[in-house]
């Protein structure tokens, strides 16, 4: 299954209605979906938040962010919650999520790429977390996966400076799984998807939550998670072989 951002004329700039739609898609995935690709049309994955959202009155059909911010911190906090779900939901879904990223992935675009489990990037990719340079912070569920990928110090440096990270550096610091020429991005992503689909589905479905648990579990807790997961898998294999 592929979810594609399709506003290339605006460099796939994002608005809140898109975030709500992303959440709906993640929540509604069919049981038989094993891999999801997050992709984008055009020369850029996403240039981030549409700056029109930061103008007085906002954009037609979208919530007025400045009006909510002026009302109270609590009003803005409540407004942001459902928007974050468009990103955080992809970290929780059962399928493996792969982002195919070309060109700009800035701010919200960077955070959408971080919502994926794996990132394949084109050699023209430019990651940047620009929120701090605008007087804000990254707030679309991107801070945890960023720190997981590159560590606290590097995450602080990237967010505080807002500098651009290219393909080779992204691979070197753990932001990207691999980098390929832009013309090979789709084919390489398809090859990765086929490799993932070639694994036994029950094992792949058990692996993702197991590794996520390892991020916060103690070693004693994690070995329990491992043996419980393995017990279920081996029991299923035995039953499939006609044993009881």
Segment roles from a protein language model:
Residues 82-86, 142-145, 154, 206, ...:
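Hydrophobic alpha-helical segments typical of transmembrane helices
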Residues 10, 40-85:
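Glycine- (often His-adjacent) and acidic-residue-rich active-site loop
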Residues 25-28, 82-94:
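Catalytic-core regions built around general acid/base machinery
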Residues 1, 29, 45, 58, ...:
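C-terminal alpha-helix plus adjacent terminal tail
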Residues 88-202:
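Crotonase-fold acyl-CoA enzyme core
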Residues 18-21, 79-82, 226:
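Hydrophobic alpha-helical membrane-association signature
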Residues 1-41:
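Conserved CoA-thioester-binding segment of acyl-CoA-metabolizing enzymes
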Residues 3, 7, 21-22, 38, ...:
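Terminal peptide-recognition signature
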């Amino acid at each position: 299954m592929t979810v594609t951002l399709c506003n290339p004329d605006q460099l796939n700039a994002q608005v809140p209605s898109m975030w709500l739609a992303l959440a709906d898609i993640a929540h509604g995935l069919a049981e038989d979906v094993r891999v999801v690709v997050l992709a984008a049309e055009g020369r850029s994955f996403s240039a981030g938040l549409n700056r029109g959202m930061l103008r007085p009155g906002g954009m037609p059909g979208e919530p007025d962010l400045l009006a909510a911010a002026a009302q109270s911190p609590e009003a803005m906090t409540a407004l942001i919650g459902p928007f974050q779900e468009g990103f955080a939901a992809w970290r929780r879904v059962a399928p493996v999520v792969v982002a195919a990223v070309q060109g700009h992935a800035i701010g919200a675009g960077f955070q959408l790429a971080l919502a994926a489990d794996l990132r394949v990037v084109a050699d023209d990719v430019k990651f940047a977390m620009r929120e701090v340079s605008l007087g804000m912070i990254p707030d679309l569920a991107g801070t945890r996966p960023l720190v997981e990928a590159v560590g606290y110090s590097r995450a602080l440096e990237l967010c505080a400076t807002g500098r651009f990270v290219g393909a080779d550096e992204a691979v070197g610091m753990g932001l990207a799984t691999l980098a390929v020429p832009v013309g090979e991005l789709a084919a390489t992503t398809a090859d990765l998807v086929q490799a993932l689909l070639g694994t036994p589905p029950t094992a792949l479905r058990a692996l993702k939550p197991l590794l996520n648990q390892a991020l916060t579990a103690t070693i004693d807790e994690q070995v329990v998670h491992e043996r419980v997961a393995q017990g279920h898998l081996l029991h299923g294999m035995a039953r499939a072989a006609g044993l009881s």
